[in-house]
Amino acid sequence: MKKLKVAILYYSSTGVNYQLAQWATEAAQSAETEVRRLKFRETAPQQAIEGNDAWKAFHNSEENKRETEASLDDLEWADVLIFSVPTRYGSVPSQVQSFIDTTGGLWFEGKLANKVVTAMTSAQNVHGGQETTLLSIYKTMMHWGAIPVAPGYTFQESFEVGGNPYGTSTQTDGTGKVLDDVKPGVEKQV
């Protein structure tokens, strides 16, 4: 039987969504899938990065530097797409949207249809737009013809990690720390 190909696509300014993507990678590998963990290209001005100590520290870290950037070939390759992105004003960050805006050719050729998609997110406060961020990802995926798969309330860990039916979401303190114990939720969602 052919192994499922899983692309874990993340953007992380301070390391929180990198951590979620690592947990998702471990969970996908334990399910004996072929996995690629890929980051979205950083497009923020250097001045913005330098103005935030946590962002600067993660951006310049060895772990961030050795991660591979996502490409359109990765989207075409994958059977399953797992997104982990921070919330920006109730939507995805510009780095993620810029990448999504380049997928028109794949979409037009039908190469994004029937891919299974799920997503997770983080924000600095409890009601920081996590649910709308996940819905904005799923809305785009529906335009692609992909198949969004949210965890819903199908496992106990969902309630223990904030109860977001659209995907695992967590709160961060802005320094790169995950404030909630969401690892079990990430593992179940994957």
Segments from the language model and where they lie:
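Accessory recognition modules or surfaces
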Residues: 13-15, 20, 47-51, 120, ...
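Glycine-rich phosphate/pyrophosphate-binding loop and the adjoining helix
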Residues: 147-190
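N-terminal beta1-alpha1-beta2 submodule of the flavodoxin-like/Rossmannoid cofactor-binding fold
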Residues: 1-111, 174-189
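Short, glycine-/small-residue-rich phosphate/pyrophosphate-handling segment
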Residues: 113-161
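Gly/Ser/Thr-rich beta-alpha loop segments that engage phosphate groups in nucleotides
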Residues: 86, 92, 130-131, 169
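Alpha-helix boundary/capping detector
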Residues: 101-108, 125, 143, 167-168
